[in-house]
């Protein structure tokens, strides 16, 4: 039995790992890049580095040093107590397989991204300083710090696990977020590395879900968790006539740090970003920002159609349009809860200024700005569309990033509001994958995009499964296999004679 499991485990790893070369994103198209030494962003990095050193060895951040060991066991040890199960190859083989896969996938993705931005010195290298973990300093000294691999893997693991264990979602997200903060405290990353690392994780969570084999692995992991705990992790369909998906149990934004106070140096960064971006209002970018005040489903369909590669409309792509429309009406409780909790004042209100779009000023006068709802809606739409068409993911994320920045330009949001909004979007996206109705509509949208009106029959031992067939080297088989032999389908080994 053990030998059989190890064989299938190895075959599945080979299969999914073989897909990596096809789906590594060019993150330079949608990440802002490392800041220049003379920029406000870099001054903020310096401030955060100094803050991190004051947090070392404090009770709150006692895990900061252990979080710096970039290996599967680190994440298993961090999340097992939260999940309530000892994650291991023998106790939870399906969950373990998922984490092993995203670890290997993530290493490849972050290495490619690091190289695309060039070498950025880590804080301890720049200042000839020491970290919390001196024994691994040499290992990382020649590896670029941007974006943060620790923030990336922590957030990607959290997004994956909340789909498997949605009943633990808030604690999982808090722990995943803290991996990035730990890397600042330990001295291995700048704040800008961490912000971009988490954003990169948001992007790759959709790339992973565009693979049928990964979705099958996730289904097995979800079933395993439910069998082990007796806790249902599937949201059944709601009223099909409802304008939104079930959203009573969306992840709470309690994993987010409190927004910067007026006395903090972090607020100085937000203020400088506000001043710099307000100067763009008379430019083409400023014109786009004024149009981007619209957060309706129709506007989302319009602005993402070019990046998506197909017109999104009720007449041309009704299944995709209906999915985006329903997603657009779903996420508000996730960010409104945080807005009410933090009650942060919008820039134009605090500074007694005008925005570049005055028509909305009265409406947002008494609304909290943190996190940005527009940023959440834009990133969520982009993530859903990127799962349907992963080949255009980079362009979709570039437009989502611009849509968020438009809120800083118009004066309705601070930069930290916008950064937080993208994270909220990623948690809602993961949550939606526990919703039966969302998954059905996603399948219809994918079929529509691929030019199919029905579900294509694929081979398995009964020749009726929906899953594609792969050779052992990871090559996908189109149509009927021409040769006998062993194939992989879903998470099963198939023998065709």
Language model regions located:
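Catalytic phosphate/nucleotide-handling subdomain of diverse soluble enzymes
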Residues: 202, 426-428
